[in-house]
Amino acid sequence: RGLVDVYKRQVTSLRSRGFSPEESAQIISLAQARTRARAKFGERARTLMLTQEAAEQATRPVTAHYRAQRLRPVAGTVADLGCGIASDSAVYAADRGAVVAVELDPLTASFAAKNLEFCPQARVYSGDVTDYVHGELLDAAGEPVGIVWMDPARRELRGTKKAQTERLFDPEAFSPPFSFVLNLARTGVPMGVKLGPGFPHEGIPLPEYIASEANPNPRVEAEWIQSEGSLAELVLWFNALAQEGVARTATSVHELPVEEADLDESPEEIPNESSNEDSKKTSALLPPYEAVSFRSPLTAAEAQQSVEVPVSLPQPGEYLLEPAPAIVRSHLVAEFAQSIGAHLLDEHLAYLCSAKPVEHPLVACYEVLEEIPLQEKQLKRWVREQGFTALTIKKRGVDIVPEQLRARLLGSAGSKTSKKKQKKNANSSSGAQEPTYRPATLVFTRIGSGRDSRRIGWHVRPL
C-alpha cells in the first residue's frame, strides 16, 4: 500500500505540472527503471534511457569491456545488430571510438541514440537486422563495418504487458533466428553472438558447418563467461574472432577497484576524451577488471570420448574442489581436473578431490574434516553435539533443499534472533562470555548411478 500511495503522489505531482496521465506514467516508469539499474550501471544509470526489461537483459559494463578486448585483434567498426538500449554498443564505442547500432523497435532505437550521444562517430539505425547484408552497412566514415556483434532476443511476450516475458529455447524462435546467424557466419565476417549460458552443447555448430566458398577457413569458439562468480552468458565467436585451436573456453571476469587499475594505460587507448564529461562516461563504460580463462581444443562430445581422469573420494585431511560455474556449464570439468592434477569424485559429478590444497581462480577448495551421517535424525544430533549454530549446505545430485534442511537441523539455534545474539556474543570484547557462534559447511552428493548409487556427505572447511 505504501508504494501505491507514493506512486499516486508522484502522478499527482506530475499532473499538476501539466503532464498527461500517459506521460506521467512513462516518466515514473523511467525513474523506477533507472533506480533499479544503478546496481548494474552505477551512477551512469541516472542519465540512461531504458526500460526495466531492457535493464534486466543488458550486460554489466565489466563483462562487455572484457568482450571489447576480445574484439581488439580485428580492425574496423563494430555493428551491433539488435542493440536494444545500446548497453553493449556504448562499450564498443568507448573502446573503439565508433559503432554502428541497429534496432528493430523505433522507440528503443531512439533510446539507443540518446545513450550513444557521447560518441560522435556512433550511428543508430532502426530496422530489421535480417535485412542486413555484410558490406552494405557503413560506419560514420563511410566504410563497411568490420565486426558483427549480435544478441538475439530470447524472450517472447506473455500476457498483456510488455514486461511479462518468457525465455525461448527454440533457436529458430530467436529474433533473429539462429539460422540467420549461421548464414551470416558463412560469409566469413568476424562475429560474436551472445546466447544464454544454458544453450545446449549439441546446438553449437562445428566449424565445417559454416564453411563456404566465401569462408574456406572457418573457426568457432564457444565461451562461457561468469562475472563475480555468477554465470552470465555464452558467447559464440566465429571466424577471425575465434581463437585458433580452441573449441571451448570458460572465463571468470572480476571487476577491480579503480585504484587497482593499470595506471600506465596509454591515453590513446581511451577514445573520445574531448571533454571531461565524455571522459568520465568512457571510464564508467570501461571498468578495470581481471579475467581468468581455461581453454580446450576439444568439443564436449570429443572430450567425453577421449579424456580420462582417475576417480576417487576424498579422505579426511584431503581436499574437495568445487569448479566455477563456467567450468561446469562448459563441460570442462574433466579437462580442468587433469590440468590441476585432481581426481573426479564421479564421472558424472562436478566435484573434484585432491591430496593437496589447490589455489586457482576457477575452483573453490575445501579441506575435508570428516564424513557425516546421512540420516536426518542422526545428522541433527551430530549438529547439536558439535554445537554448530550456522550451516552452509552445498549439494550436487541429491534431492535436498538446503534452506529447508538447514532450518530442520538447527531448529531454534538457526533463527535470525538467535544468530544475532550469537554473533554479538562472539564479537564481545568484555570477556564475560565465550563465543557461541559456530558456523559449519556441509557438502552432500551422490556417487554412482542406478542401483549402485549412494549418498555421501562431508563436513568441510573452506580455504
Predicted ranges, named:
Residues 2-7:
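Short, small-residue-biased leader/transition segments that mark boundaries at the very start
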Residues 85-97:
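Conserved SAM-binding loop of SAM-dependent methyltransferases across substrates and taxa
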Residues 98-103:
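Conserved SAM-binding motif I beta-strand of class I
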Residues 8-43:
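N-terminal, Lys/Arg-enriched amphipathic/low-complexity engagement segments
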Residues 32-73:
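Class I SAM-dependent transferase core
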Residues 75-84:
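Conserved class I S-adenosyl-L-methionine
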Residues 104-144:
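S-adenosyl-L-methionine
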Residues 1, 13, 149, 154-414, ...:
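Class I S-adenosyl-L-methionine
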